[in-house]
Amino acid sequence: MNMGIDFPKKLTAAYNAVCKPLCRELNIPQTAFDILMFLANNPDYSTAGDIVNVRKIKANLVSVNVEKLAKDGYIERTNIEGDRRKRRLSLTEKAQPIVGRGKQLQQSFFDMLFENTTDEMKKNFTETIGIIDRNLDEMLKG
C-alpha cells in the first residue's frame, strides 16, 4: 500500500461509506453533512473560506451546500465586523440533532479504525502522531 496515496483515499472512502446510511436517513448530501460536522468540531474555523481551505471541499460545493443549509435553517450567516466579504457560519438549534448523531457516528468510526489493536498500540499511535505534528510545525517555521 502506498501510504501517501492509498491510505488517505481508503480512509476517506471508508468514512464516506460509514456516513452514507445516516445521510440517506436524514436526507442530506454527504457534503452538507461534512460542512455541519466541520463547523461543530472546529469552532475556530467558521467561514466558507475556512471550510474550503481546511476541510478541502471545493468552493462551488461549499457555496451551494451552505446556501441550502441556510435556507433549510441548519446554519445562520452573520457579517464579520471589519470584512464585508466574509460571513461567519454558525449552527442553529435545528442542526443539533444531526450534529449529535454525527458525533456518535464519528466516534463509532474511530472505534472501528482501532479494532484489533491494544491500548498500548493506540497510545503509541497517538504519541507518534503528536511527534509528527511537532515535526511539521518545525518544518513550517523555517
Where do the PLM segments sit?
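N-terminal helix-turn-helix DNA-binding core of bacterial DNA-binding proteins
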Residues: A17-L61
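Hydrophobic structural patches
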Residues: P8, L36-L39, I129
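N-terminal leader segment of winged-helix/HTH proteins
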Residues: M1-L26, D72
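Charged, amphipathic alpha-helical coiled-coil/dimerization segments
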Residues: K68-E127
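Alpha-helical linker/hinge and terminal dimerization helices associated
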Residues: L11, Y15-V18, I98-T117, I132-L140
